[in-house]
């Protein structure tokens, strides 16, 4: 059974645990709820506190002295956000959760977009910039963010950045589309649904919703 397989008798603990660590995806459920315009999973202050902690403890401004026994997605003077950190005075399991020292791009984009959604714009953009600087076309291929292989799909979490900035929401049942952008004065955003895609633009107090391909059946615009 699981206990027999993962129990480490010598050290008296389960293997592959987070323990008292700070995990990059600790509020992942709230991220999904935010993107899908669902009810809150956690209190707002708890989510913001968690995202603050992820940036404070998991973001590494210089990889040169970062010890990583696993796969190397960042090195030397590069920056990145690690999977799980163990802040000072927090006990680290002898055998922690696998890949905890790595900087996986899909997780980094998820955390960064969530920071932006919850008002931590500068922190989120710093995390995104760290990824893109590693894949600048000189050191690595900018079109192939390697994780568990070439062209790994998890980096598509970067699409959530568009949703974070535009505040795009859609309710198919009510035929309602909405935009709650972090920039209120003027903006131009791309939107996409299963039936089509287009743009929304606000300029000089005028809002323009365009369908560039396919169709869009609406009853409400919020």
Specify the residue positions occupied by each region the protein language model found.
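Non-catalytic C-terminal accessory modules of carbohydrate-active enzymes
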Residues: 74-79, 90-93, 97-103, 108-222
């Amino acid at each position: 059974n699981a206990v027999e397989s993962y129990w480490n008798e010598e050290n008296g603990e389960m293997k592959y645990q987070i323990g008292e660590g700070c995990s990059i995806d600790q509020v992942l459920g709230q991220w999904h709820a935010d993107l899908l315009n669902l009810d809150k999973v956690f209190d707002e202050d708890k989510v913001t506190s968690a995202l603050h902690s992820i940036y404070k403890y998991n973001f590494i401004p210089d990889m040169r002295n970062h010890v990583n026994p696993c796969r190397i997605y960042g090195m030397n003077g590069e920056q990145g956000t690690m999977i799980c950190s163990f802040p000072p005075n927090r006990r680290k399991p002898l055998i922690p959760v696998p890949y905890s020292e790595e900087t996986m791009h899909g997780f980094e984009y998820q955390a960064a977009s969530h920071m932006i959604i919850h008002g931590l714009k500068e922190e989120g953009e710093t995390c995104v910039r760290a990824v893109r600087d590693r894949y600048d076309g000189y050191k690595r291929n900018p079109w192939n963010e390697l994780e568990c292989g070439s062209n790994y799909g998890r980096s598509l979490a970067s699409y959530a950045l568009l949703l974070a900035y535009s505040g795009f929401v859609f309710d198919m049942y009510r035929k309602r589309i909405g935009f709650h952008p972090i920039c209120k004065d003027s903006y131009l955003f791309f939107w996409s649904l299963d039936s089509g895609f287009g743009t929304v633009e606000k300029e000089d107090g005028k809002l323009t919703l365009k369908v560039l391909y396919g169709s869009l059946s609406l009853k409400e615009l919020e």
